[in-house]
Amino acid sequence: FDPLDGSSRDLPEKSVGADGRTTVLLHFEPTQALFLVLRDGEPTSTSGVNFPHLKPVMTVEGPWTVTFDAAWVKPLPPSVAPGSKEVSVAFDQLADWSKRPEDGIKWYSGVATYRKSFNLPAGVRPNRPMFLDIGVVKEMARVQLNGQDLGVAWCPPWRVAVPAGLLKASANQLVITVANTWNNRLCV
C-alpha cells in the first residue's frame, strides 16, 4: 500500500521458504515509504512483476511560459508595467526559478504557474496510462493536463499518474503550479 497516493497492488514476485517465511522483492524510490500487508489464505497473482520498470516515452522540451504574482516580484523587470497583476517570463526549459538571473524572479517566494503546449511523438499511444515526472520541485506542485487535475507532487519521486486516454496526439496543455516557502525570499 502506497500512503502517498492510496494505491495498492499485488506483489507476485515472492517466495515462501521451508520455514514459512515470506520473502518479497521490493523497490523504493528515495525517501519513499510503503506498507506491506500480508494476508493468510488470500489468493494473489503469481505472474508479473512487483514494480514495473518505467521507461521514458518522451521529454517535454522547449520554452515554458511562467507567470508570477507581480505583488511579490521585487524588483519588477523593466518590461513589466507598474500596477500589473502578473509577471510573465519565458523559460527555455522547465527549471527552478531561483536559478534565474533576474533578482525579482530569483528571490520570488510564492506561487508560480508554468504552462506548456506539446505534441506526442509519433508512435506514442495516448490510450495507455503513463506517469509524468516533473523533476525535483521545491516545495510542491499541482499538475494539470488538458484541464484535468492530476494531483500534487510534494516529495520524491515527483511524478503524477496520467490516466489512459487523457493525452492527445497534439495540442496537449500542461500546467504546473509550483509553490515555494518564504525561505527563498528571506535569503536576499
Task: Outline where the language-model segments fall.
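Short, hydrophobic/aromatic-enriched beta-strand segments in well-ordered soluble domains
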Residues: 34-41, 116, 173-180
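C-terminal beta-strand-rich structural cap/linker in extracellular carbohydrate-active enzymes
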Residues: 20-44
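An acidic-aromatic loop/edge-strand motif
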Residues: 44-110, 168-188
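Solvent-exposed beta-strand/loop surfaces of large extracellular or lumenal domains
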Residues: 1-22, 138, 144-160
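Short beta-strands within extracellular/lumenal beta-sheet-rich domains
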Residues: 108-122, 158-161
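Extracellular Ig-like/FN3 beta-sandwich strand-entry sites
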Residues: 33, 127, 169-171
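Aromatic-lined ligand-binding clefts that engage carbohydrates, nucleic acids, or primary amines
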Residues: 107, 118-120, 124-146, 174-178
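Surface-exposed, short loops/turns at beta-strand junctions within beta-sandwich domains
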Residues: 28-29, 166-169
